[in-house]
Amino acid sequence: MNFRSPSLILEPMRILRVSFLLALSGNLLWAAEPKMQPLPAPLSNNAVASLKARGGLRLYSLMGIGPKKKWDAVSNAVYALDPDTGEWTELRPVPGTAGRIAAAAAGARDHVFLFGGYVLDAQGGETTVPDVSVYDPLSDRWSRASDTPVPVDDSVIGVYQDRYIYLVSGWSNNDAVRNVQVYDGAKDKWLQATPIPGTPVFGHAGALVNDTIIYVDGAHRNPAGSQPKYVASDECWMGKIDHHDPAKIQWSKLPSHPGNARYRIAAGGSEKDQKIFFSGGTDNPYNYDGVGYDGHLSEPVAVTFAFNLRTGKWETLNDKTPNPTMDHRGLLVAPHGLVIIGGMEQGQRVTSRVTVLPRK
């Protein structure tokens, strides 16, 4: 008579139970991370912001340019994404007669603040605007704040202590500027902070985490004075904000990040991870249509990397990021991952896609 040990009988049952629990946990994880619906309309160079208010976390897309990539394709539309459901809601548009591109947005003090950008006219002319618009999500209303002293577009934005909003460098009508401008959301006043010591740039990327600003790359005038008119910058900088004076910044140069210098990378910071993340962008600067200043078509780069504030080092997260995009004003760090909204895909196609990348 063959006798099987109880442990041998129970072992298949344990395996089945573990398999069931793993499958169940996988289903629960999938259910907890809904697929993000695409933007209601394809948009690129759109400002983005996140804000956790009474209704929970919302991710915002503001203005941008549509698939035609011409002056009459610039939008003033505003959309909000609920990351828990993956659904978008169209909100009251940004006030004004024309939409803008290359604006900067940030969530602070229970509001969304929208700064600058530029408008296009039918002849291709560009005007950087000083406008500061403030959106209240509870009332779905816009108000106007004090104008930016030096109007900028294609700048880097960051928030300090949920009060001070920093605009770092950027383009101002005729050239890039070194200004670091600080908006005091509590007093509706502006401060001029320690300017950047590096080359004035536009289309650079970065973020502010705790008291630290990190920005990289962008474009600047060709120092040779020949074609192309603008070339990519490979400079990377860190700024430490003085705890007693938000207008004082100690700047220091960082080593180059992984990969080539790039333009209009999607970037965003995470206090939880103590990292500033970067993804996509292009190594061939252009204006707004994806055609490089050198006459060649620009294409997105498939590298995602981060600056680790704990170690002070660069980290490559993925050098083969699927379906990379360019022409960004930022990325948003959410519990679901790194959220990239819209942008330009390969072939300079404006997309409505919402990409969620892992944070590791």
Stretch-by-stretch model annotation:
Residues M1-R4, E11-R17:
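Positively charged n-region of N-terminal signal peptides that target proteins for export
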Residues I9-E11, A23:
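Low-complexity, intrinsically disordered segments with a bias for serine/threonine
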Residues R17-N27:
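Bacterial N-terminal signal peptides
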Residues A31-K360:
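Kelch-like beta-propeller repeat domains
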